[in-house]
Swiss-Prot record:
It catalyses: D-ribitol 5-phosphate + CTP + H(+) = CDP-L-ribitol + diphosphate. GO terms for biological process: cell wall organization; isoprenoid biosynthetic process; poly(ribitol phosphate) teichoic acid biosynthetic process. The keyword Transport does not apply. It comes from Streptococcus agalactiae serotype V (strain ATCC BAA-611 / 2603 V/R). This is Ribitol-5-phosphate cytidylyltransferase.
Length: 240
């Protein structure tokens, strides 16, 4: 059974205020963010293949990056859809073409470059044991729910609160079945794969990941990634 990373790099980075270049292609130490992300999957032995879902206007650019950085596990680069959900669906369809039978798919954000091999392996193991894996971190602060009047309607028990991140992983046949049924019913804009699977009452299993597994969405996130990346490099160089 194959383990396939489906890496979503479909955003255009409006909140980053970048001029012309989508956020996933911004460079840190001479390497685009999306390449930093793919590198983790490339260097994880358990990963057999990677599918990249890309902004349609940047397909050639992404293919050039695959060649330039020798990302040999990237077997397909496909154009995204009109929504995040539809983009992921296109990536899953490409994964289906690669898989010889059912597969474990790890759906990941291209702008989460601080994932690690341990979490990827834990996702794969969780899918094999329970059918799903949603990489998450424990909430450090209290989560509250609000009503339409912006009044707090519920204070959530922090000891039971997690923040869902990525990868979010499933058997390919399971997530594709749900995606196809949802699309047939006009559901095309679920916020993420775990939300969609939850709508279909599928059991979802937590896999705890690192807090530094941030999604680079704003300039603050970008500079935080640079700082964390430099800290990791210094640890390797100086044995800190």
């Amino acid at each position: 059974m194959m383990n396939i990373g489906v890496i979503f790099a479909g955003g255009v980075g409006r909140r980053m205020n970048t001029k012309g270049k989508p956020k996933q292609f911004l460079e840190v130490h001479g390497k685009p963010i999306i390449v930093h992300t793919i590198d983790i999957f490339q260097n994880t032995e358990a990963i057999d293949a990677v599918v990249v879902v890309c902004v349609s206007d940047w397909l050639d650019y992404m293919n050039n990056l695959v060649e330039r950085f020798n990302l040999t596990k990237v077997k397909a680069v496909v154009a995204g859809g009109e929504t995040g959900q539809m983009s992921i669906f296109k990536g899953l369809e490409a994964a289906e073409q690669l898989a010889t039978d059912d597969a474990v798919v790890l759906i990941h954000d291209g702008v989460r470059p601080l994932i690690n091999e341990e979490v990827i392996n834990a996702n794969i193991q969780s899918v094999k044991e329970t059918g799903s894996a949603v990489t998450s971190v424990r909430a450090k602060e209290t989560v509250v729910l609000v009503n339409d009047s912006s009044k707090i309607s519920e204070v959530v028990d922090r000891t039971r609160s997690f923040i869902a991140k990525a990868p979010q992983s499933f058997y390919l046949s399971d997530i594709l079945s749900v995606e196809r049924d949802a699309i047939s019913k006009g559901i095309t804009d679920a916020i993420d794969s775990s939300t969609l699977m939850g709508m279909y009452n599928r059991e979802l299993t937590i896999v705890e990941g690192p807090y530094e597994n941030i999604k680079i969405t704003t300039p603050d996130d970008f500079y935080m990634f640079k700082a964390l990346y430099d800290a990791r490099e210094n640890e390797q160089i100086y044995g800190m």
